[in-house]
């Protein structure tokens, strides 16, 4: 029996019934969240003497989850002013907030630790604003290392035809020729992020080796930095969440420890999101209708792409289970679809489940990351509720 309630059908159904939850809804397992954050922190500390995890709040910005990140000594990785506000509301120390891109003035006013800047023009703007406010601002330059993350092309971020980052040769030339003219910024490090949902650790090995070369070139030009931010990207097992509820953080950090030469000299940063929260959440939905079209069995549920857009957007595949005790020996292959007026509103095709009837509940697993945060009100849908168990 699995120790986590979201993977125990009986206990999950009891919780839903006892609290009269209205579907669709998200349910998060607090014990799994705590265990995952603790595991990540222990693995980090075992592998490095001077490193920090910044929780990538874009994965799930629920205040309770941000509070758990703070509890385990993690900083927050933000990409908007709203995310900075959420972190500050949860009393996260601004010196443990890193920020990429927008709402620059808000970040400067709150004295965040550093910007992760991904264009040279952005650095000019930051310097101008900092000069006007008479402040010094820390910046890590986001490098595009031209590394294939071997992931879906929508979430690849580290190749030259991706929109993110600056080619290292341009960074080196700028540091040598232009940096001296920017009086209100301090370049303290390099920032990388090659993609998301990365399962092949060879990608992280390549990133570590590439970063070694970049540091070597900087030092050959008498340019010294103190921080390296490797970003995130560590994936989760969407096919077997019950068997693999917590990712191999030890293997992830050990790969950087083994192949990055400067671990003992520099402060290292990691921006983890999906790997910390993805497996902790389940989207619960109710069967609205069954229908058969020329032999194809459809089950229409009350959750749609407005609640979980990943299948429609990324062709993502989530494990789905029927929370029922009857008909478990009677199987049927279904197209599992939502009620939204879009042909892409499909969770799975030819997916085998026990025979379903109106009112049965389904659990869509691995929905703790990029689920509720990507929800929309398209078709004037009400906001999906979240619960912690």
Curated annotation (Swiss-Prot):
Example GO BP: lysine biosynthetic process via diaminopimelate
Coiled-coil spans in chain: none
A single MF term (Gene Ontology): diaminopimelate decarboxylase activity
Residue sites binding pyridoxal 5'-phosphate per the record: 233, 271-274, 370
Transmembrane segments: none
Catalyzed reactions per annotation: meso-2,6-diaminopimelate + H(+) = L-lysine + CO2
E.C. designation(s): 4.1.1.20
Annotated residues for binding of substrate: 274, 310, 314, 342, 370
Any single Pfam family the record assigns to this protein: Orn_DAP_Arg_deC
CDD domains: PLPDE_III_DapDC
Co-factor requirement: pyridoxal 5'-phosphate
Domain of life: Bacteria
Leading EC class: lyase
Family: Belongs to the Orn/Lys/Arg decarboxylase class-II family. LysA subfamily.
Job description of the protein: Specifically catalyzes the decarboxylation of meso-diaminopimelate (meso-DAP) to L-lysine.
Protein name: Diaminopimelate decarboxylase
Species name: Francisella tularensis subsp. holarctica (strain LVS)
Gene of this entry: lysA
